[in-house]
Design a protein with these regions (language model features):
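Bacterial N-terminal signal peptides that target proteins for export
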Residues: 2-16
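C-terminal motif of bacterial Sec signal peptides marking the signal peptidase cleavage site
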Residues: 23-26
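A short, solvent-exposed, low-complexity linear motif enriched for acidic/polar residues
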Residues: 28-324, 330-335, 347, 354-360, ...
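Intrinsically disordered, low-complexity Ser/Thr- and acidic-rich flexible linkers and loops
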Residues: 337-341
Length: 642
């Protein structure tokens, strides 16, 4: 029996408010006179150079025009490693919220037991964390005022539940100053978060929780929402919709597609089977034309022991060496079945064997996987029995095949980066620089092939994928996929996707010293901004592992333009809208005040009012994509810290 079921009876009443109403929001049934709607709260992050950034999210409180302050999710506290949210968002809650118009949100983060690590010469190193005064950090409060044209409105209705997404994003780059000159490094935190009713990214949303029920006929299943590694709190419930032809399921080590996967899920035990769905959010209408709701459509689902179970623990990380059936993992996270997690700065070990079940996430083409399918360079999530021997090395034995201790390994899509050396039909050679942001120098590829693997001529099987137009030898490329089986190289890697600089999400970041600047822009119009980097202490564009120094000789600061959102459906909220924000520390210690805008012109108009001598610009962080040929950075979000 899964511990989430054992502890179910101990959940607080506040965490279970109106579960029936929440289900109605997903299925567009009646909710009559509850006086509540739904706020689907998601968490994401804008990345920075951290190997871990673990803090507690203590609370999220909305301020309504009528009801005043209302805390979502009751007293539930979630421990979050925000570095794991660079490619996905997590559904934090599907909370019942009183009908009202909400104009702001207040998020409380607790740094008392924070685990924040940075990379020092390829080694994850735990940092000393301080606030702006140099003192140890405890709780920090971020108050965000919504765009006045896009407030969070839960409307009273008798036809169907009103439901709105609230997308929270933690900008790690704008929130932190890292001093690498100290030993260990020092991280000064001034948390910067945004909140909006439309996300400023198109990331998939992970929805985790124990199964309530499933229906092949309806094409859906329903879960209690338990984000991250939570085993106690149920933060509402949600119905997830399946594509009968394309949704990929991996359940107890077996892969299914579409309705067959839902039928297999139907055979599992409600309440004890843990699931995690990777979904796309789709705003939708209701029976009342004035009220909107939404759907979460799954592309990939994990369930049962493939995801987690009562008997085993998990270990996630990058395989940097393999000796026989012993894997060495760098930057690993231990996931205990109590709900606790632990980031490991030191290398950890996973033991494999013929009984280890191996699967590949969101993949139906890799067949015949076994314990020899795991090789150096692969990102994995393993399940097995955890121990901490006298050596002090975190060890996970995933070699067993018993019913109460089934070892398993999930192969997770891994990203290579480096200049292209050459290419031909079905193949490419890469001058490999990093794997999942780790420098190639930390990998010991011994055993991956009969001959030595050479990073400077790393062989990639591209299959039917074409090298993008305009890519020549020396051009940087980003390749996603999995490593080839242990001992089989070359090729060294099987590619699932090949991307170039112009299509990979990046970050433009400009920092000034503690005195800041009152003139951060050389141009500032309703169509674009150009940052004056001449007096900046640092100015870079980071695209994955690539760094472009904007202060280097001959560099020209790019024009930053807002991303144009795709055309939406009339009468429905947008699933994606760019977001632009400005904010600073207030006179109240540990409190940041931020104002968000979906309108770029409104944001630009506000900048000269906010950036003055008393509150100069300290950091500017834009997320988006960079076009080197036009020297243009197209921003889905811009955060200004002053």
């Amino acid at each position: 029996m899964h511990p989430s079921f054992i502890r179910y009876a101990r959940q607080s009443l506040s965490a279970l408010l109106c579960a029936g109403a929440i289900f109605a929001a997903g299925c567009h049934s009646n909710n009559y006179t509850s006086g509540y709607g739904i706020a689907w709260v998601t968490l994401s992050e804008t990345p920075a150079e951290f190997t871990s950034y673990t803090v507690n999210v203590d609370s999220v409180t909305l301020t309504g025009k009528t009801v005043g302050a209302y805390t979502i999710g009751g007293t539930a506290v979630e421990t979050v490693d925000f570095t794991k949210l660079d490619k996905i968002s997590e559904l934090w809650s599907a909370a019942s919220v009183p009908n009202d118009t909400y104009t702001s949100a207040s998020i409380v983060l607790d740094y008392t037991s924070a685990n924040i690590s940075v990379m020092v010469n390829g080694v994850p190193t735990k940092a000393t964390v301080v606030d702006s005064t140099g003192a140890a950090v405890t709780t920090q409060t971020i108050n965000v005022t919504f765009d006045p044209t896009n407030t969070l409105t839960i409307q009273p209705t008798y036809a169907s539940s009103s439901a709105v997404r609230l997308a929270l994003n933690f900008d790690l780059a704008a929130s932190s100053v890292v001093n690498m000159a100290t030993s260990p490094p020092t991280v000064t935190v001034k948390p910067f978060m945004t909140a909006a009713t439309s996300a400023s990214d198109t990331k998939q949303i992970r929805v985790r929780g124990p199964l309530i029920n499933s229906s092949v006929g309806v094409g859906s299943y329903t879960v209690y929402v338990r984000p991250f590694y939570d085993e106690i709190n149920s933060l509402g419930s949600l119905t997830i919709f399946n594509d009968p032809n394309t949704t990929v399921y991996t359940i107890y080590g077996t892969t299914y597609v579409g309705s067959a996967g839902l039928a297999a899920l139907l055979q599992t035990s409600a309440g004890t089977t843990m699931t995690a769905a990777y979904t796309n959010y789709q705003p939708s209408g209701t029976l009342n034309a004035a009220v909107t709701a939404g759907k979460f459509n799954s592309t990939f689902v994990l369930a049962g022991s493939t995801l987690e179970d009562y008997y085993t623990q998990g270990l996630e990380g990058d395989v940097t060496a393999r000796n026989g059936n012993t894997l060495t993992l760098t930057g690993s996270t231990l996931q205990l079945n109590s709900g606790a997690s632990q980031y490991n700065d030191a290398p950890a070990v996973v033991l494999l064997g013929p009984g280890t079940i191996v699967t590949a996430d969101d993949n139906t083409t890799l067949t015949g996987l076994n314990y020899n399918s795991v090789s150096v360079g692969q990102h994995i999530i393993a399940r097995g029995i955890y121990s901490l021997p006298a050596s002090g090395v975190v060890t996970l034995d995933a070699s067993s095949s018993t019913s109460t201790n089934q070892g398993s390994v999930r192969l997770v899509s891994t990203q290579l980066w480096g200049p292209l050396v050459s290419s031909a039909s079905g193949s490419a050679v890469l001058n490999l620089q990093t794997i999942d942001h780790w420098p190639v120098s930390i990998y010991n590829f011994a055993g991956n092939g009969a001959a030595a693997v050479t990073p400077a001529s790393y062989a990639v099987n591209t299959g039917s994928l074409a090298i993008p137009a305009g890519v020549a030898a020396g051009s940087p490329v980003w390749i996603d996929g999995v490593t080839t089986p242990f001992g089989s190289a070359p090729p060294d890697f099987n590619a699932f996707a090949i991307n170039t600089e112009v299509s990979v999400p990046g970050r433009l970041q400009v920092d000034w010293s503690s005195t800041g600047t009152t003139a951060p822009f050389t141009t500032s119009t309703a169509t674009g901004l150009t940052v004056d980097v001449s007096a900046a202490s640092a100015a870079v564009i980071r695209i994955g592992s690539e760094t472009i120094d904007l202060k280097a000789a001959g560099s020209v600061s790019p024009l930053i333009v807002p991303q144009t959102p795709p055309a939406g459906t009339a009468g429905l909220p947008a699933a994606f809208l760019p977001l632009f924000a400005i904010g600073n520390l207030t006179a109240t210690a540990g409190t940041t005040a931020i104002t968000a805008y979906n309108s770029f012109s409104a944001f630009v108009t506000q900048l000269p009012t906010s950036i003055v001598a008393a509150t100069p610009a300290l950091h500017i962080v834009a997320a988006g994509t960079y076009n080197r040929s036009t020297n243009t950075f197209t921003a889905s979000s811009i955060d200004v810290v002053n």
